[in-house]
Amino acid sequence: MNRGELYRVYKGSKHDPKKYRIFVVVSRQVFINSEYSSVICAPIYSNYNGISTQVPVGVQEGLKYDSCIRCDELISIPKSMLTDYIGHLSEEKLEELNKALRIALAAEYYFEY
């Protein structure tokens, strides 16, 4: 498992009406490789509003439809639920994801990059 990989998760949340949702792993690689049983993920939705905390994704990443990663809705998911691999983000998309995560967490105000 690597940062930036997309996985289909069946019934990821009891509040989600969909049968499954696709998530992208956003935890840092050292945490993913650790003994911890969960990783931080961001959900992917089909509707894109163009806000700064959303990253557009689509067929290039292994999806059927144009969609977006929502960095304002991070959740912890057990690694054992991340088994249905869909695809991965390009280096360019990972940079967009990093920027959207910094905005979502207000991290650009606290850290110099």
Regions found by a protein language model. Name each.
Residues 16-20, 25-59:
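Compact nucleic-acid interaction/catalytic patches
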Residues 61-113:
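C-terminal terminal-subdomain/extension
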